[in-house]
Curated annotation (Swiss-Prot):
This is Imidazole glycerol phosphate synthase subunit HisH 1. SUPFAM superfamilies: Class I glutamine amidotransferase-like. PROSITE patterns: GATASE_TYPE_1 (PS51273). Gene3D superfamilies: 3.40.50.880. Residues 1-201 form the Glutamine amidotransferase type-1 domain. HAMAP family: HisH (MF_00278). One of its GO terms (biological process) is L-histidine biosynthetic process. It comes from Campylobacter jejuni (strain RM1221).
Length: 201
């Protein structure tokens, strides 16, 4: 059973509908104790890094997530802002500490790239590692992105990249911690396939 963490940051309904399409049992976790009932966790999110961390703290999720993920070793998937929150720090609205599951930081796309920010729309993945999330998904497949910030971290955690002005991290894996900058729930059949792969872990 998958807990979708509700911390007032966005796209819960679309993620829940995607899981329903593939027959996956899920529920909305509105408080930290709810996480104990799940065997997998999902941290979605759209919006500001700083505001999201503030909400997680106020709702009591930060320590609960660290317990469930780092101690209990439950698999977790972070989507978009959810992925960014896994890093050590972000700079949106000033320097802000993240959850620290993965070493690295979250920075804004450079203004001098002459590109529209946010990066919005379909983009091709360069799959760098055959991790479980990409089982049955071909290299150069397209997924849907909406973001103004991107992750900088060690290559050892990067499972895919995409190109927007320069190459950026499209997905991460560190042991049982998985994350995508793109939105699988908005990426049609390939996105559903990725979510199925997460369920099967």
């Amino acid at each position: 059973m998958i807990a979708l963490i509700d911390y007032k940051a966005g796209n819960l309904n679309s993620v829940a509908k995607a899981f329903e399409k593939i027959g996956a049992i899920n529920f909305i976790a509105k408080n930290p104790k709810d996480l104990q009932k799940a065997d997998k966790l999902l941290l979605p999110g759209v919006g500001s890094f700083k505001e999201a961390m503030k909400n997680l703290k106020e709702l009591g999720f930060i320590e609960a997530l660290k317990e469930q993920v780092l101690v209990q070793k439950k698999p977790i998937l972070g989507i978009c802002l959810g992925m960014q929150l896994f890093l050590e720090r972000g700079y949106e609205g000033g320097v802000c500490e993240g959850l620290g599951f993965i070493e690295g930081e979250v920075v804004k796309f450079e203004e001098d790239l002459n590109l529209k920010i946010p990066h919005m729309g379909w983009n091709e993945l360069e799959i760098l590692k055959q991790v479980p999330l990409y089982q049955g998904i071909d290299n150069k497949s397209d997924f849907y992105f909406v973001h103004s910030f991107y992750v900088k971290c060690k290559d050892e955690f990067v499972s895919a990249k995409a190109q927007y002005g320069h190459k950026f991290v499209a997905s991460l894996q560190k042991d049982h911690i998985f994350a995508t900058q793109f939105h699988p729930e908005k990426s049609q059949n390939l996105g559903l396939k990725l979510l199925e792969n997460f369920i099967r872990l």
